[in-house]
C-alpha cells in the first residue's frame, strides 16, 4: 500500500538522518571523552615528573621503577622552610638582611623535614595509585616508565627519564577508527602516539609532549 511504502521510506529517511547525526556527534563525543582522559593523565604525569625531579635531586639519578618512586615518597623526607614575618620597607632601606633579622629575633626562619609525599603531593595523596593511568574504565593500565643516560652536545652525561601511555591503551574502549586516525597522524609526524613526559632519546628538560 501507499501508506506502507510511505512508512518504510520514512524509516529509511530517519535512519539516514540518524547516521548523518552520528557521523557528526561521534567525533565530537570522542573528542570530549578524550579530553577528559587527557586532562586526568596529564595531571598524573606532572605529579610523576615532580616526584622524579626530587628523587634525582636526592639520589643523582631518576627512579627506575614505580616501586622505587613510591618508597621515596613514603619514606624519604625533604626540607620545608617555615617563614614567619618579613622585612619591612624601613629595614630593607637600612640594608638589613634576612639573616640579620633572624639573628635579632625580628623574623623566624626554620627548616622542618617533611615526608616527600606530603611536601610534593599533599598528605592525602594516594601514592599506590601513581603508577596507574587514571580515568580509563575497566582493567587497570600501568604507565610505562624507564630511565637512560644521554650525552649532551658538550659531552656531559645527562640522566633522563620517560613515562608514557599510548593512545591504543587509554582509548581502547573508544571508536577504533578515530583512534587509528590519531595514531596514524602522530606516527606520520614522527611523534609518540600517546601522552609522554620526558624522553629517552633527547634531552628535553622533562617536558611533556602536550606542552
Question: Which ranges hold each PLM region?
Answer:
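Short, small-residue-biased leader/transition segments that mark boundaries at the very start
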Residues: 2-5, 9-13
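Amphipathic alpha-helical segments typified by the pilin-like N-terminal helix
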Residues: 4, 18-40
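N-terminal alpha-helical signal peptides/signal-anchor transmembrane segments
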Residues: 38-59
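Low-complexity, acidic interaction segments enriched in glycine
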Residues: 57, 61-211
Amino acid at each position: 500500500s501507499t501508506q506502507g511504502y510511505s512508512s518504510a521510506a520514512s524509516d529509511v529517511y530517519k535512519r539516514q538522518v540518524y547516521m548523518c547525526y552520528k557521523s557528526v556527534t561521534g567525533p565530537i563525543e570522542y573528542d570530549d571523552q578524550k579530553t577528559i582522559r587527557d586532562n586526568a593523565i596529564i595531571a598524573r604525569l606532572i605529579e610523576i615528573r615532580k616526584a622524579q625531579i626530587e628523587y634525582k635531586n636526592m639520589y643523582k639519578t631518576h627512579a627506575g621503577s614505580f616501586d622505587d618512586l613510591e618508597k621515596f615518597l613514603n619514606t624519604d623526607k625533604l626540607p620545608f622552610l617555615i617563614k614567619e614575618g618579613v622585612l619591612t620597607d624601613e629595614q630593607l632601606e637600612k640594608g638589613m638582611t634576612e639573616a640579620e633579622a633572624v639573628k635579632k629575633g625580628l623574623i623566624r626562619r626554620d627548616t622542618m623535614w617533611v615526608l616527600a609525599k606530603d611536601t610534593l603531593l599533599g598528605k592525602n595523596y594516594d601514592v599506590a595509585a601513581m603508577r596507574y593511568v587514571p580515568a580509563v574504565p575497566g582493567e587497570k593500565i600501568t604507565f610505562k616508565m624507564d630511565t637512560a643516560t644521554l650525552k649532551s652536545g658538550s659531552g656531559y652525561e645527562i640522566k633522563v627519564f620517560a613515562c608514557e601511555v599510548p593512545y591504543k591503551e587509554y582509548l581502547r574502549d573508544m571508536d577504533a577508527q578515530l583512534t587509528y586516525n590519531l595514531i596514524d597522524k602522530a606516527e606520520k609526524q614522527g611523534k609518540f602516539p600517546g601522552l609522554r613526559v620526558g624522553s629517552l632519546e633527547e634531552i628535553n628538560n622533562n617536558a611533556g609532549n602536550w606542552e
